[in-house]
């Protein structure tokens, strides 16, 4: 299911498809109102979509299914714009938070996907269309966010309390997957609610993918943005964008300067430098957008607080500048 934000005042043949983070879905990311307003006089309209993993279903999801569904939505938008304007126009995929993992997974994995997950046996992989552009906003590490909670505590729970919860979740998850069951096992809500809330079922498989206990040497599928990932690990993700060939132009990234989901030990500017190096590789034209990628000064994770007007203005300016390079 997808929704378009558009205007009848101007022709808008080009499209941005927006994917939110864990727990998000259509109408949950408040700064999109600023983006839509900024797009009104342009040739771009914005689409949001509901994935199988949207809202409280993220704990049962996985990136292959997410990006297959994104690909189907891209095809739908292209057909819709063709019927309306006579051509598909350009399309940009923009991810917020863990939605940025969808962007990188879409661009870096085999096309179509080759996995055959027993826990999602009905999944049929599709060929993913080439994108004209891609934007990652607030790309954060779920693993490091967990480590930050273990260091600082969460709510009324001390760091020591959270360490006990985490260790128990890790032990339960490892035990659940040890037998190689073809089905997902749901972790006890009494444990997961301490971190993720009472309304979110979380499978052992997805928790291990997010927590990625074998990182940084052997990161899981969901561990794409941790600050301790080295060149060899980044080469398998950012470094695969060029050879996979699903991006016609450049990749842009915006990190929130005051992102409460990022630990204080993370060098945000350093992250952009590492990702740029891995994306561009050793040869060929640059496919990392150095001009528009940035750390947004003072921005919180979702730019949703009352004091975020200036960070939202900065974000919209960067997005509009990036889109102008594609026309």
Positions of PLM-derived features:
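Short, surface-exposed "cap/lid" segments of acyl-processing enzymes
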Residues: 2-56, 76, 264-265
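Alpha/beta-hydrolase active-site loop
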Residues: 31, 59-85, 105-108
């Amino acid at each position: 299911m997808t929704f378009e934000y558009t205007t009848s005042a101007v022709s808008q043949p080009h499209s941005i498809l927006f994917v939110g983070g864990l727990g998000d879905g259509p109408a949950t990311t408040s700064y999109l109102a600023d983006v839509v307003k900024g797009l009104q006089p342009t040739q771009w309209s914005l689409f949001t979509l509901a994935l199988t993993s949207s809202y409280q279903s993220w704990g049962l999801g996985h990136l292959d299914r997410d990006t297959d569904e994104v690909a189907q939505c891209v095809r739908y938008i292209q057909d819709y714009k063709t019927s309306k304007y006579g051509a598909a126009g350009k399309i940009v995929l923009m991810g917020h938070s863990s939605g940025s993992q969808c962007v990188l997974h879409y661009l870096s994995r085999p096309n179509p996907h080759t996995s055959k997950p027993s826990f999602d046996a009905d999944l049929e992989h599709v060929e993913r269309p080439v994108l004209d552009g891609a934007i990652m906003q607030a790309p954060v590490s779920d693993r490091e966010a967990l480590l930050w909670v273990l260091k600082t505590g969460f709510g009324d729970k001390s760091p020591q309390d959270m360490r006990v919860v985490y260790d128990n979740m890790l032990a339960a998850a490892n035990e659940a997957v040890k037998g190689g069951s073809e089905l997902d096992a749901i972790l006890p809500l009494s444990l997961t609610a301490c971190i993720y809330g009472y309304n979110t079922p979380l499978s052992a498989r997805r928790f291990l993918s997010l927590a990625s206990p074998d990182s940084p040497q052997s990161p899981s599928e969901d561990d794409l943005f941790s600050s301790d990932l080295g060149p060899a690990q980044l080469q398998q993700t950012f470094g695969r964008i060029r050879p996979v060939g699903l991006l016609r132009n450049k990749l842009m990234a915006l990190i929130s300067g005051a992102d409460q989901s990022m630990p204080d030990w993370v060098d945000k500017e350093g992250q952009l430098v590492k990702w740029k190096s891995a994306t561009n590789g050793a040869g060929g034209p640059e496919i990392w957008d150095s001009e528009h990628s940035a750390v947004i000064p003072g921005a919180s994770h979702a730019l949703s607080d009352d004091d975020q007007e200036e960070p939202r203005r900065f974000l919209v300016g960067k997005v509009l500048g990036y889109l102008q390079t594609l026309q």
